Amino acid sequence: FSYKDRVDNLRMLGIVCKLLLKHNIISVISAINPFESIRQELAAYSPKVKTVWVRCGMETLIKRDTKGLYKKALLPDGNPDKVYQFTGVSDLYEIPKNPDLILDTDKETPDESVKKLTDFILSSINNPVDIQ
């Protein structure tokens, strides 16, 4: 995907969530958002917008990659199987500057990460902020 494709998709997801929020519907976007500027743009919609960084080392990502996309992205240029514009390898991924929650998925068990995320969401719901 191009930069524009990624930004357009993230903005569209943000707009949908903003509309749902006006009706007090909680939304969770599970999307790769590699750009700090777009994270900040989405956060400006409401103080209820939160960033969760699902942090994972490259070695673990490669081990978990059932489609082999990371291995293909790491192939030398010119290789017919190489995947180009792959986020975090050959395309930009900016580490979140101030995530509201970090899930260290290469250090935590899936159950630990789920509990942290669930507790975080429930805490956010139980401590509401006025919609601005």
Regions found by a protein language model. Name each.
Residues 2-50, 70-73:
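Glycine-rich phosphate-binding loop used to anchor ATP phosphates in small-molecule kinases
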Residues 17, 117, 121:
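Hydrophobic "lid"/C-terminal helical patch
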Residues 9, 27-28, 50, 54-56, ...:
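Functionally constrained cores in energy, signaling, and assembly domains
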Residues 55, 63-116, 124-132:
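Small-molecule kinase domains that catalyze NTP-dependent phosphoryl transfer to phosphate-bearing small molecules
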Residues 34-37, 60, 108:
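Short alpha-helical
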Residues 28-30, 45-64, 103:
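Conserved phosphate-donor/acceptor-positioning beta-strand/loop module used by diverse small-molecule
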